[in-house]
Design a protein with these regions (language model features):
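Alpha-helical transmembrane segments of multi-pass membrane transport proteins
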Residues: 1-433
Length: 433
Protein backbone atom coordinates (compact mmCIF):
# COMPACT_ATOMS: atom_id res chain seq x y z
CA UNK A 1 0.00 0.00 0.00
CA UNK A 2 1.31 3.45 -0.90
CA UNK A 3 2.33 5.92 1.80
CA UNK A 4 -0.23 8.41 0.48
CA UNK A 5 -3.09 5.93 0.89
CA UNK A 6 -1.82 4.90 4.34
CA UNK A 7 -1.74 8.55 5.41
CA UNK A 8 -5.26 9.11 4.10
CA UNK A 9 -6.57 6.02 5.91
CA UNK A 10 -4.97 7.02 9.22
CA UNK A 11 -6.26 10.58 9.32
CA UNK A 12 -9.60 9.78 7.64
CA UNK A 13 -10.47 7.12 10.23
CA UNK A 14 -9.24 9.40 13.02
CA UNK A 15 -11.30 12.34 11.72
CA UNK A 16 -14.48 10.28 11.24
CA UNK A 17 -14.27 8.85 14.75
CA UNK A 18 -13.78 12.32 16.24
CA UNK A 19 -16.75 13.61 14.20
CA UNK A 20 -18.88 10.77 15.60
CA UNK A 21 -17.98 11.84 19.14
CA UNK A 22 -15.68 8.93 20.00
CA UNK A 23 -13.22 9.93 22.77
CA UNK A 24 -9.96 11.09 21.26
CA UNK A 25 -7.83 8.42 22.99
CA UNK A 26 -10.01 5.63 21.57
CA UNK A 27 -9.99 7.33 18.17
CA UNK A 28 -6.20 7.37 18.18
CA UNK A 29 -5.92 3.66 19.07
CA UNK A 30 -8.57 2.50 16.59
CA UNK A 31 -7.19 4.57 13.70
CA UNK A 32 -3.69 3.27 14.46
CA UNK A 33 -4.86 -0.36 14.46
CA UNK A 34 -6.86 0.06 11.24
CA UNK A 35 -3.84 1.63 9.52
CA UNK A 36 -1.45 -1.04 10.81
CA UNK A 37 -3.68 -3.80 9.41
CA UNK A 38 -2.43 -2.90 5.93
CA UNK A 39 1.14 -3.94 6.74
CA UNK A 40 1.13 -6.12 9.88
CA UNK A 41 -0.56 -9.34 11.01
CA UNK A 42 -3.17 -9.23 13.76
CA UNK A 43 -0.81 -10.91 16.26
CA UNK A 44 1.88 -8.33 15.50
CA UNK A 45 -0.60 -5.48 15.82
CA UNK A 46 -1.90 -6.53 19.23
CA UNK A 47 1.58 -7.21 20.61
CA UNK A 48 3.19 -4.03 19.27
CA UNK A 49 0.21 -1.82 20.18
CA UNK A 50 0.22 -2.97 23.80
CA UNK A 51 4.01 -2.75 23.98
CA UNK A 52 4.12 0.79 22.59
CA UNK A 53 1.22 1.98 24.75
CA UNK A 54 2.95 0.60 27.83
CA UNK A 55 6.38 2.00 27.00
CA UNK A 56 4.84 5.38 26.17
CA UNK A 57 4.08 6.08 29.82
CA UNK A 58 7.13 4.44 31.40
CA UNK A 59 9.16 7.65 31.45
CA UNK A 60 9.97 8.88 34.97
CA UNK A 61 9.64 12.49 33.81
CA UNK A 62 5.96 11.90 32.97
CA UNK A 63 5.26 11.49 36.68
CA UNK A 64 5.65 15.27 36.84
CA UNK A 65 2.44 15.70 34.82
CA UNK A 66 -0.06 14.42 37.44
CA UNK A 67 1.94 16.09 40.21
CA UNK A 68 1.86 19.50 38.49
CA UNK A 69 -1.85 18.99 37.81
CA UNK A 70 -2.42 18.30 41.51
CA UNK A 71 -0.35 21.33 42.53
CA UNK A 72 -2.27 23.51 40.08
CA UNK A 73 -5.65 22.31 41.35
CA UNK A 74 -4.63 23.02 44.94
CA UNK A 75 -3.57 26.54 43.93
CA UNK A 76 -6.79 27.05 41.96
CA UNK A 77 -8.82 26.36 45.08
CA UNK A 78 -6.48 28.21 47.41
CA UNK A 79 -7.90 31.71 47.01
CA UNK A 80 -4.75 33.19 45.49
CA UNK A 81 -6.44 34.91 42.52
CA UNK A 82 -7.46 37.96 44.55
CA UNK A 83 -3.97 38.26 46.05
CA UNK A 84 -2.43 38.21 42.57
CA UNK A 85 -4.92 40.79 41.27
CA UNK A 86 -4.02 43.18 44.08
CA UNK A 87 -0.32 42.56 43.43
CA UNK A 88 -0.72 43.18 39.68
CA UNK A 89 -2.58 46.42 40.38
CA UNK A 90 0.57 47.81 42.00
CA UNK A 91 2.23 47.81 38.57
CA UNK A 92 -0.64 48.75 36.24
CA UNK A 93 -3.07 50.68 38.45
CA UNK A 94 -2.29 54.02 36.80
CA UNK A 95 -2.60 52.81 33.18
CA UNK A 96 -5.86 53.36 31.21
CA UNK A 97 -7.88 50.16 31.33
CA UNK A 98 -5.92 49.18 34.41
CA UNK A 99 -8.25 46.37 35.46
CA UNK A 100 -7.79 44.67 32.08
CA UNK A 101 -4.03 45.18 32.46
CA UNK A 102 -4.21 43.63 35.93
CA UNK A 103 -6.17 40.74 34.44
CA UNK A 104 -3.47 40.13 31.83
CA UNK A 105 -0.61 40.37 34.32
CA UNK A 106 -2.58 38.23 36.76
CA UNK A 107 -3.11 35.57 34.08
CA UNK A 108 0.62 35.49 33.42
CA UNK A 109 1.31 34.90 37.11
CA UNK A 110 -1.61 32.59 37.82
CA UNK A 111 -1.07 30.58 34.63
CA UNK A 112 2.57 30.08 35.57
CA UNK A 113 1.49 28.85 39.00
CA UNK A 114 -1.34 26.56 37.87
CA UNK A 115 -0.04 25.58 34.42
CA UNK A 116 -3.60 25.74 33.09
CA UNK A 117 -4.97 28.37 30.72
CA UNK A 118 -8.57 27.38 31.48
CA UNK A 119 -7.96 27.67 35.23
CA UNK A 120 -6.35 31.08 34.74
CA UNK A 121 -9.24 32.37 32.62
CA UNK A 122 -11.76 31.06 35.14
CA UNK A 123 -10.03 32.22 38.33
CA UNK A 124 -8.81 35.61 37.17
CA UNK A 125 -11.90 36.37 35.11
CA UNK A 126 -14.17 35.42 37.98
CA UNK A 127 -12.22 37.65 40.33
CA UNK A 128 -11.86 40.72 38.09
CA UNK A 129 -15.05 40.72 36.00
CA UNK A 130 -17.33 41.98 38.83
CA UNK A 131 -14.86 44.79 39.61
CA UNK A 132 -14.64 45.75 35.94
CA UNK A 133 -18.42 45.79 35.71
CA UNK A 134 -18.62 48.13 38.70
CA UNK A 135 -16.17 50.48 36.96
CA UNK A 136 -18.20 50.58 33.74
CA UNK A 137 -15.96 48.40 31.56
CA UNK A 138 -17.39 46.99 28.35
CA UNK A 139 -17.95 43.27 29.15
CA UNK A 140 -16.68 42.24 25.69
CA UNK A 141 -13.49 44.30 26.15
CA UNK A 142 -12.89 42.70 29.56
CA UNK A 143 -13.60 39.18 28.34
CA UNK A 144 -11.29 39.58 25.33
CA UNK A 145 -8.36 40.67 27.52
CA UNK A 146 -8.96 37.71 29.84
CA UNK A 147 -9.30 35.17 27.01
CA UNK A 148 -6.29 36.35 25.00
CA UNK A 149 -3.90 36.41 27.96
CA UNK A 150 -4.96 33.21 29.77
CA UNK A 151 -2.84 30.85 27.58
CA UNK A 152 0.39 32.63 28.59
CA UNK A 153 0.62 30.07 31.40
CA UNK A 154 1.21 27.34 28.80
CA UNK A 155 4.51 28.99 27.90
CA UNK A 156 5.63 30.46 31.23
CA UNK A 157 6.88 27.55 33.38
CA UNK A 158 6.30 25.34 35.15
CA UNK A 159 3.96 23.84 32.55
CA UNK A 160 3.10 20.24 31.78
CA UNK A 161 2.91 21.03 28.04
CA UNK A 162 6.70 21.20 27.87
CA UNK A 163 7.00 17.94 29.82
CA UNK A 164 4.71 16.15 27.36
CA UNK A 165 6.66 17.62 24.44
CA UNK A 166 9.97 16.57 25.99
CA UNK A 167 8.77 12.99 26.22
CA UNK A 168 7.56 12.72 22.63
CA UNK A 169 10.55 14.66 21.25
CA UNK A 170 13.01 12.10 22.56
CA UNK A 171 13.92 13.46 25.97
CA UNK A 172 14.69 17.11 25.21
CA UNK A 173 15.88 18.83 28.40
CA UNK A 174 12.87 19.97 30.42
CA UNK A 175 14.82 22.65 32.27
CA UNK A 176 15.99 24.10 28.93
CA UNK A 177 12.42 24.08 27.62
CA UNK A 178 11.24 25.85 30.77
CA UNK A 179 13.80 28.61 30.32
CA UNK A 180 13.02 28.84 26.61
CA UNK A 181 9.36 29.52 27.34
CA UNK A 182 9.88 32.59 29.52
CA UNK A 183 10.59 35.29 26.93
CA UNK A 184 7.93 34.10 24.41
CA UNK A 185 5.40 33.85 27.26
CA UNK A 186 6.22 37.34 28.48
CA UNK A 187 6.15 38.61 24.88
CA UNK A 188 2.68 37.12 24.52
CA UNK A 189 1.54 38.93 27.67
CA UNK A 190 3.11 42.23 26.56
CA UNK A 191 1.30 42.02 23.21
CA UNK A 192 -1.98 41.59 25.07
CA UNK A 193 -1.19 44.57 27.32
CA UNK A 194 -0.41 46.80 24.32
CA UNK A 195 -3.66 45.86 22.59
CA UNK A 196 -5.63 46.41 25.82
CA UNK A 197 -3.96 49.82 26.27
CA UNK A 198 -4.81 50.92 22.72
CA UNK A 199 -8.40 49.73 23.16
CA UNK A 200 -8.71 51.62 26.45
CA UNK A 201 -7.32 54.83 24.93
CA UNK A 202 -9.72 54.62 21.99
CA UNK A 203 -12.66 54.12 24.35
CA UNK A 204 -11.53 57.00 26.57
CA UNK A 205 -11.19 54.73 29.61
CA UNK A 206 -9.56 56.04 32.76
CA UNK A 207 -7.13 54.34 35.09
CA UNK A 208 -8.87 52.67 38.01
CA UNK A 209 -5.99 53.50 40.32
CA UNK A 210 -4.30 51.47 43.00
CA UNK A 211 -6.41 49.94 45.74
CA UNK A 212 -5.34 51.68 48.95
CA UNK A 213 -7.58 49.62 51.22
CA UNK A 214 -4.41 47.85 52.32
CA UNK A 215 -0.77 48.92 52.27
CA UNK A 216 1.63 48.10 49.46
CA UNK A 217 3.71 46.05 51.89
CA UNK A 218 0.64 44.01 52.88
CA UNK A 219 -0.26 43.43 49.21
CA UNK A 220 3.25 42.20 48.41
CA UNK A 221 3.34 40.08 51.57
CA UNK A 222 0.04 38.39 50.65
CA UNK A 223 1.22 37.52 47.14
CA UNK A 224 4.82 36.60 47.98
CA UNK A 225 4.23 33.02 49.22
CA UNK A 226 2.42 32.11 45.99
CA UNK A 227 5.02 33.78 43.77
CA UNK A 228 7.81 32.08 45.71
CA UNK A 229 6.60 28.75 44.33
CA UNK A 230 7.89 29.71 40.86
CA UNK A 231 11.29 30.63 42.28
CA UNK A 232 11.59 27.40 44.27
CA UNK A 233 10.45 25.02 41.53
CA UNK A 234 12.11 26.61 38.50
CA UNK A 235 15.23 27.55 40.45
CA UNK A 236 15.57 24.03 41.80
CA UNK A 237 15.09 22.39 38.40
CA UNK A 238 17.42 24.70 36.47
CA UNK A 239 20.15 24.59 39.13
CA UNK A 240 20.02 20.80 39.19
CA UNK A 241 18.93 20.54 42.83
CA UNK A 242 16.07 18.31 41.73
CA UNK A 243 14.55 16.93 38.53
CA UNK A 244 11.30 18.16 36.98
CA UNK A 245 9.44 15.27 38.60
CA UNK A 246 10.95 15.98 42.02
CA UNK A 247 10.20 19.66 41.47
CA UNK A 248 6.56 18.78 40.83
CA UNK A 249 6.50 16.88 44.14
CA UNK A 250 7.99 19.91 45.89
CA UNK A 251 5.28 22.06 44.27
CA UNK A 252 2.53 19.79 45.64
CA UNK A 253 4.00 19.88 49.15
CA UNK A 254 4.45 23.66 49.03
CA UNK A 255 0.88 24.19 47.78
CA UNK A 256 -0.47 21.96 50.54
CA UNK A 257 1.41 23.96 53.17
CA UNK A 258 0.05 27.21 51.72
CA UNK A 259 -3.51 25.89 51.71
CA UNK A 260 -3.14 24.91 55.37
CA UNK A 261 -1.76 28.34 56.27
CA UNK A 262 -4.52 30.13 54.33
CA UNK A 263 -7.15 27.67 55.66
CA UNK A 264 -8.63 27.70 52.17
CA UNK A 265 -9.27 23.97 51.69
CA UNK A 266 -10.98 21.57 54.08
CA UNK A 267 -10.59 17.78 54.04
CA UNK A 268 -13.67 17.22 51.88
CA UNK A 269 -12.46 19.82 49.41
CA UNK A 270 -9.04 18.20 49.31
CA UNK A 271 -10.57 14.82 48.46
CA UNK A 272 -12.44 16.50 45.62
CA UNK A 273 -9.17 18.01 44.36
CA UNK A 274 -7.50 14.58 44.47
CA UNK A 275 -10.37 13.03 42.51
CA UNK A 276 -10.39 15.79 39.91
CA UNK A 277 -6.60 15.60 39.53
CA UNK A 278 -6.75 11.82 39.13
CA UNK A 279 -9.38 12.12 36.40
CA UNK A 280 -7.43 14.76 34.49
CA UNK A 281 -4.16 12.84 34.88
CA UNK A 282 -5.78 9.61 33.70
CA UNK A 283 -7.09 11.31 30.56
CA UNK A 284 -3.72 12.87 29.73
CA UNK A 285 -1.66 9.74 30.45
CA UNK A 286 -3.99 7.55 28.39
CA UNK A 287 -3.67 10.08 25.57
CA UNK A 288 0.11 9.82 25.81
CA UNK A 289 -0.10 6.02 25.84
CA UNK A 290 -2.42 5.91 22.82
CA UNK A 291 -0.36 8.46 20.91
CA UNK A 292 2.76 6.34 21.39
CA UNK A 293 1.06 3.60 19.38
CA UNK A 294 0.07 6.08 16.67
CA UNK A 295 3.60 7.49 16.54
CA UNK A 296 4.96 3.99 15.92
CA UNK A 297 2.43 3.32 13.16
CA UNK A 298 3.25 6.64 11.49
CA UNK A 299 7.00 6.03 11.71
CA UNK A 300 6.69 2.41 10.51
CA UNK A 301 4.55 3.50 7.56
CA UNK A 302 6.88 6.36 6.65
CA UNK A 303 4.20 9.03 7.07
CA UNK A 304 6.44 11.74 8.63
CA UNK A 305 9.00 11.30 5.85
CA UNK A 306 6.26 11.48 3.21
CA UNK A 307 4.83 14.69 4.65
CA UNK A 308 8.33 16.13 4.95
CA UNK A 309 9.10 15.28 1.32
CA UNK A 310 5.77 16.76 0.28
CA UNK A 311 6.49 20.06 1.99
CA UNK A 312 10.04 20.21 0.70
CA UNK A 313 8.83 19.50 -2.84
CA UNK A 314 6.92 22.78 -2.66
CA UNK A 315 9.98 24.85 -1.75
CA UNK A 316 13.41 24.58 -0.21
CA UNK A 317 13.12 28.02 1.39
CA UNK A 318 13.17 27.46 5.14
CA UNK A 319 11.26 30.66 5.86
CA UNK A 320 8.35 29.53 3.70
CA UNK A 321 8.51 26.03 5.21
CA UNK A 322 8.32 27.48 8.73
CA UNK A 323 5.40 29.69 7.66
CA UNK A 324 3.54 26.69 6.22
CA UNK A 325 4.19 24.72 9.40
CA UNK A 326 2.79 27.57 11.48
CA UNK A 327 -0.34 27.77 9.34
CA UNK A 328 -0.92 24.01 9.62
CA UNK A 329 -0.26 23.96 13.39
CA UNK A 330 -2.49 26.98 13.91
CA UNK A 331 -5.37 25.24 12.13
CA UNK A 332 -4.70 22.05 14.11
CA UNK A 333 -4.84 24.06 17.35
CA UNK A 334 -8.27 25.35 16.39
CA UNK A 335 -9.66 21.82 16.22
CA UNK A 336 -7.62 19.83 18.75
CA UNK A 337 -6.63 20.20 22.40
CA UNK A 338 -3.00 20.87 23.17
CA UNK A 339 -1.92 17.47 24.56
CA UNK A 340 -3.07 15.25 21.66
CA UNK A 341 -1.83 17.87 19.18
CA UNK A 342 1.66 17.76 20.72
CA UNK A 343 1.67 13.97 20.81
CA UNK A 344 0.43 13.41 17.26
CA UNK A 345 2.14 16.16 15.30
CA UNK A 346 5.54 16.48 16.98
CA UNK A 347 6.81 13.27 15.30
CA UNK A 348 5.63 14.66 11.95
CA UNK A 349 6.91 18.23 12.05
CA UNK A 350 9.95 18.06 14.35
CA UNK A 351 12.13 16.23 11.79
CA UNK A 352 11.15 18.79 9.15
CA UNK A 353 11.99 21.70 11.44
CA UNK A 354 15.37 20.28 12.47
CA UNK A 355 16.29 19.49 8.86
CA UNK A 356 15.98 23.22 8.15
CA UNK A 357 18.12 24.23 11.11
CA UNK A 358 15.52 24.85 13.83
CA UNK A 359 16.46 23.30 17.18
CA UNK A 360 14.16 20.96 19.12
CA UNK A 361 13.88 23.63 21.81
CA UNK A 362 12.76 26.40 19.46
CA UNK A 363 10.32 24.09 17.68
CA UNK A 364 8.77 23.08 21.00
CA UNK A 365 8.18 26.73 21.91
CA UNK A 366 6.76 27.47 18.44
CA UNK A 367 4.46 24.44 18.61
CA UNK A 368 3.04 25.34 22.00
CA UNK A 369 2.67 29.01 21.01
CA UNK A 370 0.47 27.83 18.12
CA UNK A 371 -1.59 25.75 20.51
CA UNK A 372 -2.00 28.81 22.75
CA UNK A 373 -3.63 30.62 19.84
CA UNK A 374 -5.81 27.59 19.17
CA UNK A 375 -7.05 27.84 22.76
CA UNK A 376 -8.70 31.20 22.06
CA UNK A 377 -10.31 30.37 18.71
CA UNK A 378 -13.44 28.38 17.82
CA UNK A 379 -14.58 25.68 17.37
CA UNK A 380 -12.63 23.91 20.16
CA UNK A 381 -11.10 26.90 21.96
CA UNK A 382 -11.66 25.92 25.57
CA UNK A 383 -10.40 29.24 26.94
CA UNK A 384 -12.73 31.12 24.58
CA UNK A 385 -15.80 29.33 25.90
CA UNK A 386 -14.76 29.59 29.54
CA UNK A 387 -13.88 33.27 29.17
CA UNK A 388 -17.21 34.07 27.51
CA UNK A 389 -19.07 32.20 30.24
CA UNK A 390 -17.21 33.99 33.03
CA UNK A 391 -17.67 37.38 31.34
CA UNK A 392 -21.36 36.76 30.52
CA UNK A 393 -20.87 37.60 26.84
CA UNK A 394 -21.50 35.65 23.64
CA UNK A 395 -18.76 34.53 21.27
CA UNK A 396 -20.19 36.89 18.65
CA UNK A 397 -19.87 39.85 21.04
CA UNK A 398 -16.27 39.12 21.97
CA UNK A 399 -14.99 38.18 18.50
CA UNK A 400 -14.51 41.74 17.25
CA UNK A 401 -12.57 42.60 20.43
CA UNK A 402 -10.44 39.47 20.11
CA UNK A 403 -9.29 40.08 16.53
CA UNK A 404 -6.67 42.75 17.45
CA UNK A 405 -5.27 40.40 20.11
CA UNK A 406 -5.12 37.54 17.62
CA UNK A 407 -3.28 39.68 15.05
CA UNK A 408 -0.76 40.86 17.66
CA UNK A 409 -0.18 37.32 18.91
CA UNK A 410 0.32 35.99 15.37
CA UNK A 411 3.00 38.65 14.88
CA UNK A 412 4.60 37.53 18.16
CA UNK A 413 4.46 33.92 16.95
CA UNK A 414 6.26 34.87 13.74
CA UNK A 415 8.89 36.70 15.78
CA UNK A 416 9.45 33.57 17.90
CA UNK A 417 9.65 31.50 14.70
CA UNK A 418 12.15 33.66 12.85
CA UNK A 419 14.20 35.07 15.73
CA UNK A 420 15.77 32.07 17.52
CA UNK A 421 17.22 34.28 20.28
CA UNK A 422 13.72 34.86 21.68
CA UNK A 423 13.50 31.22 22.73
CA UNK A 424 17.17 30.22 22.88
CA UNK A 425 18.71 33.37 24.34
CA UNK A 426 17.83 32.76 27.99
CA UNK A 427 18.80 29.05 28.03
CA UNK A 428 22.07 29.96 26.30
CA UNK A 429 22.74 32.73 28.80
CA UNK A 430 22.25 30.25 31.64
CA UNK A 431 24.56 27.70 30.04
CA UNK A 432 21.81 25.16 29.33
CA UNK A 433 22.59 24.91 25.61
Amino acid sequence: MSITLTTVILFAVFGVLLFLGVPISISIVVSSIVTAMSTLSWDQITFITMQKMNSGVESFSLLAVPLFILAGNIMNNGGIAKRLVNFAQLFVGKIPGSMAQANILGNMLFGALSGSSVAAASAMGGCISPIEEENGYDPAYSAAANIASAPTGLLIPPTSAFIVYSTVAGGVSISTLFMAGYIPGILMGLCCMIVAFIGAKKAGMKATGIDHSQSIAKTVWDAAPSLLLIVIVIGGIVSGIFTATEGAGVAVLYCLILSIIYKSIDFKGFLGILLNSAKTSGIILFLISASSAMSFVMAYSGIPAAISNGLMSLTDNKYIIFLLMNIILLVIGMFMDITPAILIFTPIFLPIATSFGMTEIQFGVMLIFNMCLGNITPPVGSVLFVGCGIGHVSIEQVTSKLIPYFVALVLALLAVTYIPALSLGLPSLMGLI
